[in-house]
Regions:
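Proteins with a high burden of low-complexity, intrinsically disordered sequence enriched in S/T/G/P/A and R
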Residues: 2-16, 56-60, 65, 74-77, ...
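Acidic, serine/proline-rich low-complexity intrinsically disordered regions
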Residues: 3, 144-378
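Short, structured coil/loop segments at alpha-helix boundaries
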Residues: 10-13, 42, 82-84, 216, ...
């Protein structure tokens, strides 16, 4: 039936695999291109560096830049590389709980209130700019970069700068008026560490937030957007988004608190309305919370949307299901599962082909018998 025999299975030997890796390295090192320094990646590609650090769960900008250069800009590959590096690190300390009210704020905005204590601080953002290609970047040099930095610093009014200080939470205004949903007795007090304990459903809120902080940015944005469009979530109002640095404290062997450094984070608190119930006729407001490494405001806001959606419970929509959200936004796992389809599966597929060929032959034999029987009766 098959005139051409099936091809022999391909043997991916070590020699062939090593040659393929050399070709991949050659593609990155094409002649005529200038190598990109790791310091340049850290300084000029901070958005993608922050994304890789957050999804890998490791605050190390230099290592994230190395992983990104090694992966040729593939964020999924870079996250897997950085997570692999993270597994060999020794956990020497556990930091104290960080109070983000003590954040050194670089950016702080609220869409819920026009005026907030301390004022709105736009900080570094492109939210209000047009998304047009900047052709000047094509001719950018070290000299033009230095000139632009010098001009920016010269234009600063040092006298107008306010003293450095921290800001209280905008949502504390609602809490002071008793407008936020009161805390319930079943809300956890112990933090579930997803790097040490497996997740079981229904998962505690701390585990859900940790999973979202390490989730793939595009995946949680898609699910959060589905919730905004009515598929199991809501359309919140941004109580506050803040970007800044927070101090990291640990306790040394003598029991003394030590500041070992700081990390840059983005924090978002979304305000949503609660549906009125007969048992509780007061339409309180509820908060959805998100916090992630670096400046990744989209991710933090989407975390808050999904935090609120998963607290609603039920299985009516993907954004509500804890299991669906946590499993399907885990970028490293989903990337690995999809790309594993490219690995050799010759034995299984050959078995399927043999079964199919046998079934086709049996069908042809039955058809031939029926045709012969019909011919004998005619």
């Amino acid at each position: 039936m098959f005139s051409t025999p099936p091809p022999a299975p391909v043997q991916f030997t070590r020699k062939v695999i090593a040659a393929a890796e050399r070709v991949a390295r050659f593609e990155r090192l094409r002649r005529g291109t200038t190598p990109i320094a790791v310091a340049s990646l850290r300084g000029q590609f901070r958005a993608v560096i922050d994304q890789v650090m957050g999804e890998a769960g490791l605050y190390a900008s230099e290592h994230a830049a190395l992983a990104l250069a090694q992966a040729e800009g593939d964020t999924h590959e870079a996250v897997v590389i950085l997570r692999a590096f993270r597994t060999i690190l020794v956990r020497r300390y556990t930091s104290a709980v960080i109070d983000t009210t003590g954040m050194f704020v670089e950016r702080r905005i609220s869409s819920a209130f026009r005026e907030i204590p301390g004022g709105q601080i736009l900080g570094p953002t492109r939210d209000y700019s047009q998304r047009l290609l900047d052709a000047a970047l094509a001719t950018e040099t070290a000299a033009t970069v230095d000139a632009a930095a010098t001009a920016f610093e010269a234009g600063l009014d040092r006298k107008a700068l306010k003293p450095l200080r921290t800001f209280g939470k905008v949502t504390s205004l609602l809490r002071a008026e008793g407008l936020l949903r009161p805390a319930t007795e079943d809300e956890e007090t112990r933090v579930h560490d997803i790097t040490r304990e497996p997740i079981r459903f229904p998962a505690p809120r701390s585990a859900r937030l940790q999973s979202l902080a390490r989730a793939e940015t595009g995946a949680i944005m898609a699910l959060a957007y589905s919730g905004m469009r009515g598929q199991g979530g809501d359309h919140p109002t941004i109580g506050e988004v803040r970007v800044g640095r927070v101090a990291v404290r640990v306790t040394d062997a003598r029991g003394r608190a030590r500041v070992i450094g700081s990390v840059r984070v983005t924090e978002a608190e979304n305000i949503s309305k609660i549906k009125v119930k007969k048992k509780d006729p007061v339409p309180y407001m509820s908060l959805g919370y998100g916090l992630c490494f670096g400046q990744n405001e989209t991710k933090a806001i989407c975390m808050g949307i999904l935090d609120r959606s998963m607290r609603l419970g039920g299985d009516g929509a993907p954004a509500i299901s804890q299991e669906f959200v946590i499993y399907h936004t885990e970028g490293a796992d989903s990337w690995g599962s999809v790309n594993s389809l490219k690995l050799p599966a010759h034995v299984e597929f050959a078995s399927d082909l043999n079964l199919l060929r046998a079934a086709v032959e049996r069908k042809l034999a039955r058809d031939a018998e029926k045709a012969a029987a019909a011919a004998s009766h005619s």
